[in-house]
Amino acid sequence: MSLSVEAKAKIVADFGRDANDTGSSEVQVALLTAQINHLQGHFSEHKKDHHSRRGLLRMVSTRRKLLDYLKRKDVASYVSLIERLGLRR
């Protein structure tokens, strides 16, 4: 199951420049991170769900590309976002 409307709105409010900012890289990365974290719980129960795992890998790849773009364009917001999301880098 995907994220609820309320959860997405909270993420957009926390990471966006305003309440309707859904397109910025920071918001997109935060939404992808929430979806990835949600799917990790799914895979602890359903180890053989390879179809969903392919979707997870696609999300991880998209997040990596967005983070690389953000690192090229604005290093300060990249570092801030990584710390706020608790990602490794």
UniProtKB/Swiss-Prot annotation:
The cellular component terms of Gene Ontology attached to this UniProt record, alphabetical and capped at eight, are: cytosolic small ribosomal subunit
Q: Which UniProt keywords apply?
A: Ribonucleoprotein, Ribosomal protein, RNA-binding, rRNA-binding
Query: Could you give a GO molecular-function term held by this entry?
Result: structural constituent of ribosome
Q: Which domain of life is it from?
A: Bacteria
Q: Name one GO biological process term.
A: translation
What Pfam families would the database entry show? Ribosomal_S15
**What family is this?**
Belongs to the universal ribosomal protein uS15 family.
**Quaternary state and interactors:** Part of the 30S ribosomal subunit. Forms a bridge to the 50S subunit in the 70S ribosome, contacting the 23S rRNA.
Summarizing the function annotation, the protein's role is: One of the primary rRNA binding proteins, it binds directly to 16S rRNA where it helps nucleate assembly of the platform of the 30S subunit by binding and bridging several RNA helices of the 16S rRNA.
Q: Which HAMAP family match?
A: Ribosomal_uS15_B
Name by which UniProt lists this protein: Small ribosomal subunit protein uS15
Q: What is the lineage of its organism?
A: Bacteria, Pseudomonadati, Pseudomonadota, Gammaproteobacteria, Enterobacterales
Which gene carries the instructions for this protein? Answer: rpsO
